[in-house]
């Protein structure tokens, strides 16, 4: 069952049953909440005594249960991972207090309160493991062992950054790794394929002149001897595994040049014209991988491709969070590595 992408992708009730572990957790927490709520009402009305802070706890837990249902149905767990983890941790403390308030009592209503909060405590602990487990952790494949469509929280928050610069925002992926500083500015490319590259251009004026283009990747900034001086580069998903040859270019004053295509006067990008520049080589799909889960490509990012569970794809390189892949019908794009298993 393909999962819908979060962030306004609509509600899909079927996603509740797509992840078997989450299905069990949601059902157990619902049953536990009902038992605890009825027990607290009976204890408050009878001889069980006042429940005090547990009334705050029971409604906090209700808020969490409803929120988890909605986030699973919209496949938005990763987007709200931090908030959900924080409130679940708070609720875990109160659930332990709920157990302690009635576990040693001989009153049946208070025993029901303890039983209900015991179920809630178990689910809260597993939820915290699910929300905080990173992809590199040994627990990651365990908590996602029966997933058939729900995007794990760690998969959405690692290696991907969402900006709110426009309608719907822009999505950018880190291609170069860590942050740093350098002489030559930085190159950025948004998920829609448009690129911005900043650099220092030589000449008498010696000013800073930005260049714009529709290149799938940011401009490379090199010195006359080929040594890169650029700051961290951010490239579009289409250039995650670029096979472009290394060019040695001679710059103007200062020895710095840019390979990115410049913009013509009518807005169309002019083709790069550098003497001796080599053309890009075709990517070599040297690996094959099978999809562990179904995946629905983000409609706002044309570089992603969808695939079904069990589908075999050709892979260019198996490093990084996102792999350049080719489907059997010839469609190419990028896929999340945590959804794939190399053959």
Curated annotation (Swiss-Prot):
It comes from Sporisorium reilianum (strain SRZ2). Residues 231-281 are annotated as: Disordered. Forms homooligomers. The keyword Transit peptide does not apply. It is a multi-pass membrane protein. InterPro entries: SH3-like_dom_sf, SH3_domain, Sho1_SH3. Residues 284-343 form the SH3 domain. Belongs to the SHO1 family. The keyword Transmembrane helix applies. Keywords: Cell membrane, Glycoprotein, Membrane, SH3 domain, Stress response, Transmembrane, Transmembrane helix. Glycans are attached at residue 107. It is found in: Cell membrane. Residues 1-20, 74-83, 133-343 are cytoplasmic. The chain crosses the membrane at residues 21-41, 53-73, 84-104, 112-132. Residues 42-52, 105-111 are extracellular. One of its GO terms (biological process) is regulation of actin filament polymerization. Plasma membrane osmosensor that activates the high osmolarity glycerol (HOG) MAPK signaling pathway in response to high osmolarity. This is High osmolarity signaling protein SHO1. Residues 235-245 have a biased composition (Low complexity). One of its GO terms (cellular component) is plasma membrane. It comes from the Eukaryota.
